[in-house]
Amino acid sequence: MSGNSQALIPPRKRVDGAMVNCRFNKSIKDNGGADDVYEQAAVTQTKELFGCTVNDLYRETGGKKGRRDTLPQPAQEAYMVNESLAANELDRQIGTLGGESQDEVNSQILASVEQTSKQTRKWLPW
């Protein structure tokens, strides 16, 4: 490696749930997602991963709504795995999703998130 090789190596840091969620949301945005699609993506994946609503998940686990760090570790891990996989799939689809309206674009994004969530669910122990 030459003298400038260190500049080519990006800095590393521990990845956490917030970072994974940010990347997931960026992938939604990069595909043209807007309006309430971010909230709906959370609702969709929660339904597929846990079989309940977001409100039920937080209530039944004693978590504080809007704070995933208050959920049990297995739930946090499930969100992280799913959002990482869903972001990868959405990144693969950049430039291929479209429609006549924002609702159509959002629907395609949500369909992708739902499909990924169904696949992820098969690997979860519950």
Predicted region positions:
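Positively charged, phosphate-engaging catalytic surfaces used for nucleic-acid and nucleotide handling
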Residues: 1-126
